[in-house]
Amino acid sequence: MWGALRSVLRPCSRASVPRQRAYHGDAVARLGTQPDSGSSTYQENYEQMKALVNQLHERAQYVRLGGSEKARARHTSRGKLLPRDRIDNLIDPGSPFLEFSQFAGYKLYGEEEVPAGGIITGIGRVSGVECMIVANDATVKGGTYYPVTVKKHVRAQEIALQNRLPCIYLVDSGGANLPRQADTFPDRDHFGRIFYNQAIMSSKNITQIAVVMGSCTAGGAYVPAMADENIIVQRQGTIFLAGPPLVKAATGEEVSAEDLGGADLHCRRSGVTDHYALDDHHALHLTRKVVRSLNYQKKLDVTVEPSEEPLFPADELYGIVGANLKRSFDVREVIARIVDGSRFNEFKALYGDTLVTGFARIFGYPVGIIGNNGVLFSESAKKGAHFVQLCCQRNIPLLFLQNITGFMVGKDYEAEGIAKDGAKMVAAVSCAKVPKITVIIGGSYGAGNYGMCGRAYSPRFLYMWPNARISVMGGEQAATVLATVARDQRAREGKQFSSAEEAALKEPIIKRFEEEGNPYYSSARLWDDGIIDPVDTRLVLGLSISAALNAPIQRTDFGIFRM
C-alpha cells in the first residue's frame, strides 16, 4: 500500500517540474526596514527612550539592594544569604530569572520605603524545572507583609496556578505588618488567601515547597505547614503560631525562639518539617534535590522549531518608538525586532489595517500577534475577533502589543455598530483560553485596553515599556470633558465660565492623569507584572511563553457574538 502511495506521489519522468513563482506574500514574509538612524525623528526618539531606560535601570538597581545598608549588614552577620543571593544559588547556573513586579510598593507608602514590596517573586529553572520562586526579604521591615506584599505574593501564586508551576517559598518573615493589619488580614485576597492558594495548588498536583530560612511567625507558620515538602535551617529558621513574647503574655511561660520552634524541635519532635539544613547553602542544595525528585515532565501542546535571531538589532526599538505617544510608528517594525528571523505571516493585511494580526515564532514557540496601528474601527475589531478565534482553534498563544487610544467614536460609527463590533473583540479576548501575554508599548486608554487584553482580561503576563501610559483617557481629553461639563453647568445657571477658570480647572486634572498614568504608578500597585527594557522584550516573551506552556491548553468556548 505504502509503495503504491509513493508511486502516486513521485513525479512522472516526462513531466517538467513547475517553475517556482514569486508571490507578493513571499516578499513581505520577512518584516522590517532599516531605519534612517540619521533622521532627527529617530535620534530624538532614541535619546528620549534611552533616557527612560537608563532611569529604569537606575531605579531597578536601587530596588535590588533591598533594605538599608544597616539592615543588610545585620542580616548577613547572622550567617544568612541575602534574598537575591538565595535565588541565585537556587536556580540552575547560568539560567535567567524572570522577576515580577520589581517596583511593587514604589512610592506607595510616602516616606516609608518598601523596596520590591518586601518580597521577590519570579520564575527560575531549578534542576531543569521552571518554578515560581517567592522569597521574603527580611532586610525590608523584617520581611513583614504590607498590603502590597500580600498582593504580590498572591499574584505570584495566581501565575503559578494558571501555568502549573511548582512553587518554592524562601521564608524569612515576621508575618503581617500589624499597623496595617486592616488592609492585610480580613478580606478575601488578603493574607489568608496565600494558604488557601497553597491548598488548592497542592490538590491540583502543583508542588508546594517551603524553605524556612528565618522567622515564620503566626499565620505565616502555615506556609511550611501546608507545603508538600519543607526544609528548615538550624539555629536560623523558626516556626510558631505565637512567638516568645506572645507566649509569655498569654501563659507566663518563658521560652527561647529556638526551643519554641527551631529546627531540632520540628525535625525531631513535632514533625512539622521534613529536612534539616545546616545553613542557607545546604538548604538550597536540599531544595534542588527535592525538585529533582518530582518526576516532572513538561508536555507541550505546540510544535517548537529551532530558534532564529531577528534580522534587526533590538536597540533600534528606541529610535522607532520613542517616548512621544503622539508620534505614530508601524507596529510591524516592533514585531520585526522580537520574532524569529523577523518572519511574520500576516492575516487580513488589507482589511481593518489599524490592527495588525498574524503568526510568528519567538524562540521557536508559535505565537499569534495582535498589534495596534491606530484607533480601532469596526473592521479592525471584527478582524481581531476572527484572529483570536483562529488562535484558540489552533492552540496558539496570543501576544498583544498595546498602543491604543480606544475605539473610533462619532455618529456615523455608532450607526454602523462600533459598539457591537467592539464587543465581539472584547468577548473573544475574554473567552480565549490559550495563553495570553500583553505588552504595553505605548498608550493603553479606555475600552482599547479591554479589547487588547488589559489586566481585567486575565493575560498570563502583562508587561509595560517605560514610555507606556495607562488610564481611562488622556489627561487633556479628561480635562476637556470636565471643563465642558463645568461650562454647561455655568450656562444653565446663567453664568460665564472664563478662560482663566477653565485653565485653572484643567491644570490639576492633566497633572493628576499624567501622574496616575505613569508606568511606575501602575507597577507600584501591581496593575502589571513589571516594567521592562524594550531590548529585553524578546527574552521576556520567550521565558513567559515557555512558562505558560507548562499547563495544558484548554478548549475555548465562545458565547454569543451580536451580529
Curated annotation (Swiss-Prot):
It comes from Rattus norvegicus (Rat). The keyword Transit peptide applies. It comes from the Eukaryota. Coiled coil: none annotated. Residues 49-555 are annotated as: Carboxyltransferase. This is Methylcrotonoyl-CoA carboxylase beta chain, mitochondrial. Carboxyltransferase subunit of the 3-methylcrotonyl-CoA carboxylase, an enzyme that catalyzes the conversion of 3-methylcrotonyl-CoA to 3-methylglutaconyl-CoA, a critical step for leucine and isovaleric acid catabolism. It is found in: Mitochondrion matrix. Probably a dodecamer composed of six biotin-containing alpha subunits (MCCC1) and six beta (MCCC2) subunits. Residues 309-555 form the CoA carboxyltransferase C-terminal domain. Residues 343-372 are annotated as: Acyl-CoA binding. GO terms for biological process: coenzyme A metabolic process; L-leucine catabolic process. Keywords: Acetylation, ATP-binding, Ligase, Mitochondrion, Nucleotide-binding, Transit peptide.
